[in-house]
A protein has these predicted regions:
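Conserved, structured core segments of small domains
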Residues: 1-96
Length: 96
C-alpha cells in the first residue's frame, strides 16, 4: 500500500493561540501512525508567491490512514484551533 502525505501551507495569524495546536497535534498524528518529515523549516518557493511561510509535511502509513486522521473525532477539535489561528491549505496525496 502506498503511503499518504499531508502537505500543509500555512500563515499563522495568531501565534499565541496557535501554540496550543502545535502542542496537541503531534499526539493525534502519532495515534494514526503519522510522522513529521518537515515542520516549518527553511524553504524556497519557485513559480509562485510565498504567501504561506510555514510548510509542514507529514507521512502516514497509507493514504487511507491520512484521510482517517484528517476526518477523525480526535483531530476535529485540534483542527479547529488551527483554522481559527492560521490561513492556508492542507493537501493529502497518495504516494507511489
Amino acid at each position: 500500500m502506498a503511503a499518504g502525505y499531508v502537505i500543509a501551507q500555512l500563515k499563522v495569524t495568531n501565534l499565541e493561540n496557535y501554540k496550543e495546536y502545535v502542542e496537541k497535534v503531534p499526539d493525534v498524528i502519532k495515534k494514526y501512525g503519522g510522522e513529521y518529515l518537515a515542520r516549518g523549516g527553511e524553504h524556497q518557493v519557485f513559480e509562485a508567491e510565498d504567501n504561506f511561510p510555514r510548510i509542514v509535511i507529514i507521512k502516514f502509513p497509507t493514504y487511507e490512514k491520512a484521510l482517517e486522521w484528517y476526518h477523525s473525532d480526535e483531530y476535529k477539535p485540534v483542527k479547529a484551533i488551527r483554522l481559527s489561528n492560521s490561513e492556508g491549505s492542507n493537501i493529502i496525496v497518495k504516494g507511489l
